Each structure stands twice: as C-alpha cells, then as structure tokens.
A protein has these predicted regions:
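Short N-terminal or domain-adjacent regulatory/targeting segments
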Residues: 1-33, 43
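Short internal beta-strands
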Residues: 62-70, 138-139
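Histidine-anchored nucleotide/phosphate-binding helix
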Residues: 42-61, 65
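Glycine-rich, highly charged phosphate/nucleotide-binding loops
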Residues: 16-21, 86-104
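Active-site-proximal region of nucleotide-activated glycan assembly enzymes
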Residues: 146-179
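An aromatic- and histidine-rich active-site surface loop
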Residues: 119-132
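Structural motif
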Residues: 112-115
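Active-site proximal beta-strand in glycosyltransferases
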Residues: 135-145
C-alpha cells in the first residue's frame, strides 16, 4: 500500500519538474556542454571519470561530472568526490527524489548532452534523467516514458554491463557517427 502512495507522489513530482526541452539526436559538432552522471559504486569509476575528462578536453567540450554515491560510509571512510557534485542517499527526500537545489546546474541550465552512466532503474536516476534539461540524452537503463534518446546496454552474452569504460567508448563512437 505504501508503495502505491509513494508512486503516486513520485509521478506528481516528475510531472512538476519534467523537462519540457525537446530532445533528439544531435551531431557532435553542435554539442558544447555535456553533463555526465557516474555511479561511484561501480568498479573503476575514477578511470571512467578520467576518460570523460580527457574526451571533453580533446573534443573542446565543457564537461560537468555528477556522482551518485549511495554507499553507507563508515566513520573511517571519506567521500571520494566533491560534495557539491555528489548525490548522497541522505540527500534524498522520503520519496527518493534528489534535492533540486543541490544540482541546480543539472536541472536548470540547458546543456547539449546528458550521459547517464548509472546502470540501474532506481527512482533517483529516473527523476534526474527525466528532469535534466538537455537536448540529447544518453543512458544505460530504459525508463517508462522515454527518458533517453539513446539507451546503450550490454549484450546478454557478455559482461558489458559491468564495464562502464567500454560502454562510454561505445557512446563516443556512436556520437561520431551522427551527422
């Protein structure tokens, strides 16, 4: 019963904050600003971050990287990312909605490309994907309501789902093919 009520309020919040910016495929030559969301819990996230930054510099793009960090940190553990660009579990409200004020650049400023490297269907990433103002959206998990213009997922016979760097390479290769 509680899940039904939560879903009702989540849908209302999605409708309220959903991006009204038309999206679609955009050639790399028309892309100037990129927002990338990386899951800190995935193995090799720091290497993926470096790959994204190198690609952005090489292509002359302004890249903003945001992090999902839903780990339970112990007393001795420290946050490995900048606090202003990191979405923490304690930063969610009772519905699981991220604080819109914390990630204002993602929700209010229009960007040309959003790349979500988070490979799960949890509500916080659904909210972020549907509400981010980007002209072209790429993600790893499909959501009801077409949150992304392009969904890149691994083949069922390979372990591509766990290799974010290979997925990112595939996304870069695809972006080069759009004319």
């Amino acid at each position: 019963m509680f899940e039904v009520i939560k879903r009702f309020f989540r849908d209302r919040k999605l409708r309220k904050f959903a991006s009204d910016l038309p999206t679609g495929f955009i050639p790399l030559s028309e892309i100037h600003t990129v927002n990338v969301v990386i899951n800190v819990e995935e193995a090799g996230f720091d290497l993926l971050k470096e790959d994204v930054l190198l690609w952005g510099r090489a292509a002359g793009l302004k890249v903003n990287i945001y992090f999902f960090d839903f780990r339970k940190l112990g007393k001795d553990e420290i946050l490995m990312t900048t606090i202003d660009k990191t979405l923490l579990r304690k930063g969610l409200d009772w519905l699981g909605t991220p604080n819109v004020n914390k990630l204002t650049s993602l929700f209010e400023e229009k960007s040309d490309l959003l790349i979500s490297m988070v490979d799960n269907g949890d509500y916080p990433i659904e909210f972020l994907s549907k509400c981010a103002k980007a002209r072209f959206k790429v993600g790893r998990h499909a959501f009801k309501g077409h949150a992304y213009d392009l969904v890149v997922s691994g083949a069922s016979n390979e372990d591509l789902r766990s290799d974010s760097r290979r997925i990112f390479q595939e996304i870069k290769d695809f972006l080069l093919k759009i004319k």
